[in-house]
Amino acid sequence: YKPDTTIYYPGKLYLKRSSENGSIEQQLIFINASTVLLSVASTHKALFRFWGNVLTNDNVCSAEKNTFLVIAPSGEGVAVTFPPEAGLLANENGYETLSTTSGKTDIVISFFTNQASQRSAIQKATSVLAEVESYKKQTADRWENYLTDIIRNDMPNAYNRVAAKAVMTLISNWKVARGDLFHDGVVPSHGVGYFMGFWGWDSWKHAVALAHFAPELAKDQVRTMFDYQTPDGRIIDCIYSDASENNAR
């Protein structure tokens, strides 16, 4: 199968691969900040088989019913939840599913930071798999609301496309409160590690843009800057989920 279509829609990544035997379509949809739905469909109605390997030996792998867990030494981890009929097999190195529903299947990938959030992540994944179409619609409606507040009838279509892309970039760079980050915010980029924090010189601009379509996130973006305000009133350069990496200049 060769990839022939890749499209990043607002709120959804779409990939299609084709061969002489048919095509396979994948949709990756962020249900919320820590839950991702992967929908896979095939035109030739074959049974799907999935497998994966863990790349480092420091992580602990296990399975709970139809969920494969990978937990790092920090307690953070990833849960991959399959439909109950998938027949999940797992060991210390990875996982494999024996079979799933012919022609179509849905998988939920969840991220968690500790044992308490691990439990809620699995519960959320189970809920998503039970009502896939409902969660897809909720996500589509959320993005529709973002764009409705930005797209303007008095602007050329080319400008509206730039505005939509700006919204997609800001929301895609949304980082939730975690560790020493006490409020949500937007990071400048996922391209390099040092951009994975909240920077003073970017955060104000992020907040101004977000105020038009995600006002609560805009407020949190400002709040997080004041979480590390110095006694003399200064807002420091950048802050991270590990405060030892903060740059207080």
Predicted regions and their residues:
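Aromatic/His-enriched, Gly/Pro-containing loop or helix-boundary segments
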Residues: 12, 18-27, 237-249
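Acidic/polar, glycine-enriched structural segments that form the non-catalytic walls/loops
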Residues: 19-37, 41-196
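Accessory carbohydrate-recognition regions in carbohydrate-active enzymes
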Residues: 1-13, 31-35
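Aromatic-rich carbohydrate-recognition surfaces in CAZymes
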Residues: 139, 196-249
